[in-house]
């Protein structure tokens, strides 16, 4: 370091700055050669990367599950809330129908209330699952058809957005063709009237 006579720094401050410069120089890559490209993976990380991506994902998943569990209330299980679920009605109708039907058949055939109850509950669960899946597939298919229709309409060319060129001679041509048709119709009517007047109304046998 060049000595400057009018410098305000003391010798102690200069000695303290020299180790700092050495420490800063130690952070620089020592195996660097002139013209060499330094990649990002060769440099030390700027931020602490203690948690991996999988650990962060698990942590976020736990937080999401905790928020979902805390958001559950007893009022969510009311009849009004349950009937507002899209496929709850179809699943309930098919499940209860299967329960009554299978329970009645098993009770009539085996005369055992326990066996009939077991079969009825099993039929309720299976029927509800089948009804729910049928309703879900129908809704999914209808959503796909609606999305396809939206995409088809969006891809269509909108003619009203562009100026359509009009030929000024077209109205005159239409009028001329209309007058010509009118004159031909009148001429044919006159010919028919003349032919009918010239034809005799009596006939010799």
Swiss-Prot record:
Segments of this protein annotated with the region Disordered: 1-27, 165-205
GO molecular function: unfolded protein binding
Residue spans, topological domain Mitochondrial matrix: 110-115
Coiled-coil positions: none
Entry keyword annotation includes NADP: no
InterPro entries: Cox20 (IPR022533)
GO biological process per UniProt: mitochondrial cytochrome c oxidase assembly; negative regulation of programmed cell death
Gene Ontology CC: mitochondrial inner membrane; mitochondrion
Polar residues composition-biased segments: 184-196
Source organism superkingdom: Eukaryota
Mitochondrial intermembrane topological segments: 133-205
Record's subcellular location: Mitochondrion inner membrane
Membrane-protein topology: Multi-pass membrane protein
Membrane spanning stretches: 91-109, 116-132
Keyword set, alphabetical order: Membrane, Mitochondrion, Mitochondrion inner membrane, Transit peptide, Transmembrane, Transmembrane helix
Subunit comment: Interacts with COX2.
Known function: Involved in the assembly of the cytochrome oxidase complex. Required for the maturation and subsequent assembly of the mitochondrially encoded COX2, the precursor of subunit 2 of cytochrome oxidase.
Family of the protein in this entry: Belongs to the COX20 family.
The protein, known as: Cytochrome c oxidase assembly protein COX20, mitochondrial
């Amino acid at each position: 370091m060049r000595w400057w006579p009018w410098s305000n720094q003391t010798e102690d401050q200069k000695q303290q700055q020299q180790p700092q410069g050495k420490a800063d120089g130690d952070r620089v890559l020592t195996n660097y050669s002139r013209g060499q490209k330094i990649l990002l993976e060769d440099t030390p990380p700027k931020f602490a990367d203690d948690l991996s991506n999988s650990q962060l994902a698990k942590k976020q998943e736990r937080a999401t599950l905790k928020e979902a569990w805390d958001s559950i209330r007893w009022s969510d299980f009311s009849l009004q809330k349950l009937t507002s679920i899209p496929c709850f009605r179809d699943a309930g109708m098919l499940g209860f129908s299967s329960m009554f039907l299978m329970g009645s058949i098993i009770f009539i055939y085996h005369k055992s209330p326990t066996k009939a109850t077991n079969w009825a509950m099993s039929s309720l669960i299976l029927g509800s699952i089948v009804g729910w899946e049928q309703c879900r597939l129908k809704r999914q298919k209808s959503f796909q058809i609606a999305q396809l229709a939206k995409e088809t309409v969006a891809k269509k060319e909108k003619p009203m957005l562009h100026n359509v060129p009009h030929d000024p001679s077209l109205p005159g041509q239409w009028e001329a063709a209309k007058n010509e048709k009118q004159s031909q119709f009148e001429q044919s009517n006159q010919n028919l009237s003349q032919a009918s007047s010239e034809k005799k109304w009596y006939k010799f046998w």
